[in-house]
Every structure is written in structure tokens, then in C-alpha cells.
């Protein structure tokens, strides 16, 4: 099967999310109605979202930032939980995965897992509750 052919979200991990959210609001991009102070999301063109995630919340949910972490994550959003499970099985077979969650997990936002590439770049594979993937593979944040 392989992984779905898409990058649907770029997430910037922010030391001062209030300051960065104010900066990005100046772009005039539509902000998701489900944004909260610690996780602000802007809908971009072609089904891609820009997410701002507070450093504190990131560390609480995904672990301490490691040296060399560049302050962003790449995310592949999936149509459903079953696709997340199949993607996890695929990534488990990759050579050189630096770190991989043992299994996908559920949380208040959805279902997914994370892994790091050989240079420490963080990837997420997720099904976000209420999201949609259109016929082109474009992602719409709820």
C-alpha cells in the first residue's frame, strides 16, 4: 500500500504562540474555528494547513524537544483510522526510522502516530476527527 501521497499540514512549534499567531493572522488566511490558544490553525490553498503549536503543549503531548529539532512537523492526514493503522504497519518496515511510536493512539483531536526520520525531522500520520480529504487528496481542517 505505501503511505498516502500528500503532505497536508506544516506545524510550527512556537516559543511564544500568541506573538506568532498575531503575526500569521496578518496574512489574512482563514483561521479554523476549532483553533485554541495553544494550537492555532490556518487553512491554506490546496488542502494544506499551517498549524502553530505551543512549545509547552508540544512537549506535553509528544515529548521533550531534542537537540537539532527544527521547530516544525510534517503531517500526512488520512481518511480514517484504518488508513492510519496501515500506514503505521508500512513505516514499521522502513529502514533507518530514528523513532516510531509503538502504535497509533487516540486523543481528543483524533487518531495517529509519530516518527522521526534519520536526521530527527518529526512526522505525524493522523486521522483528525471531523476533517475531510477531497478527491484530489486535499485536506480540510474542521
Task: Describe these PLM feature segments.
Residues 3, 6-15, 42-43, 63-142:
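Vicinal oxygen chelate
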Residues 11-57:
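Core segments of cupin and vicinal oxygen chelate
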Residues 21-22, 85, 123:
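Alpha-helical elements of the RecA-like P-loop NTPase motor core of helicases
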Amino acid at each position: 500500500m505505501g503511505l498516502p501521497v500528500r503532505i497536508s499540514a506544516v506545524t510550527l512549534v512556537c516559543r511564544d504562540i500568541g506573538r506568532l499567531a498575531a503575526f500569521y493572522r496578518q496574512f489574512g488566511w482563514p483561521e479554523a474555528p476549532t483553533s485554541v490558544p495553544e494550537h492555532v490553525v490556518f487553512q491554506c490553498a490546496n488542502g494544506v494547513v499551517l498549524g502553530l503549536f505551543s512549545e509547552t503543549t508540544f512537549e506535553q503531548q509528544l515529548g521533550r524537544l531534542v537537540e537539532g529539532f527544527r521547530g516544525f512537523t510534517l503531517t500526512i492526514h488520512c481518511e480514517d483510522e484504518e488508513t492510519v493503522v496501515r500506514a503505521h504497519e508500512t513505516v514499521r518496515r522502513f529502514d533507518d526510522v530514528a523513532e516510531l511510536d509503538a502504535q497509533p493512539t487516540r486523543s481528543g483531536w483524533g487518531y495517529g502516530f509519530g516518527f522521526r526520520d534519520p536526521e530527527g525531522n518529526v512526522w505525524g500520520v493522523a486521522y483528525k476527527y471531523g476533517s475531510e480529504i477531497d478527491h484530489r487528496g486535499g485536506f480540510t481542517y474542521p
